């Protein structure tokens, strides 16, 4: 069976999409290639790294990347995680499905916001896996 590809996209590839990539690799397992990117690059937020470390997922080696058109075109599913990414997502080929899963941006907010958004992303990916 060929691996499917899921591509998580948000504005800066700093918090939400980084956490989604970490959870995606953990939850979806070997059957999926999991990537993340941003409309811009803001660097991986240290609090996102810490939030994921708290649940034993290491994203410290992740980099903040711009959308890669090759990955985009080969994706089975592109998931936008904020309205900016949803509105500015490049045109997708007809074979690529797109979904919007909106999450609040925890950047610049209290630690508890990082934990809440992290946990909401986990639940969304768990629900997706059950489809």
UniProtKB/Swiss-Prot annotation:
Catalyzed reactions per annotation: arsenate + [thioredoxin]-dithiol + H(+) = arsenite + [thioredoxin]-disulfide + H2O
- What's the impact of mutating residue 110 to P? In strain: SW18, SW4, SW24 and SW1
**Post-translational modification remark:** Cys-89 performs a nucleophilic attack on a Cys-10-Cys-82 intermediate, forming another disulfide intermediate with Cys-82.
Consequence of changing residue 62 to Q: Uncouples the sulfate effect from the potassium effect on the kinetics
Coiled coil regions, renumbered to chain: none
Q: Where K(+) is bound, by residue?
A: 13, 36, 63, 65
Primary localisation category: cytoplasm
Q: Per the record, what is one GO cellular component?
A: cytoplasm
What mutagenesis or variant effect is reported for residue 15 to A? 2-fold decrease in affinity for arsenate. Does not affect affinity for pNPP. Loss of activity
Q: List the disulfide bonds.
A: 10-82, 82-89
What, per the annotation, is the impact of changing residue 123 to I?
In strain: SW4, SW24 and SW1
Q: How does it assemble?
A: Monomer.
By what name is this protein known? Arsenate reductase
């Amino acid at each position: 069976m060929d691996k499917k590809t899921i591509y998580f996209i948000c504005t800066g590839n700093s918090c939400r999409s980084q956490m989604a990539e970490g959870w995606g690799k953990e939850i979806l397992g070997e059957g999926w290639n999991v990537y993340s990117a941003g409309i811009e690059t803001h660097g991986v937020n240290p609090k996102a790294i810490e939030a994921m470390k708290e649940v034993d997922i290491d994203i410290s080696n992740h980099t903040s990347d711009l959308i890669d058109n090759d990955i985009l075109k080969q994706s089975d599913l592109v998931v936008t995680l904020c309205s900016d990414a949803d509105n500015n997502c490049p045109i997708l080929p007809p074979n690529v499905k797109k979904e919007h899963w909106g999450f609040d941006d925890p950047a610049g907010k209290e630690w508890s916001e990082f934990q809440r958004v992290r946990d909401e992303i986990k639940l969304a990916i768990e629900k997706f896996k059950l489809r």
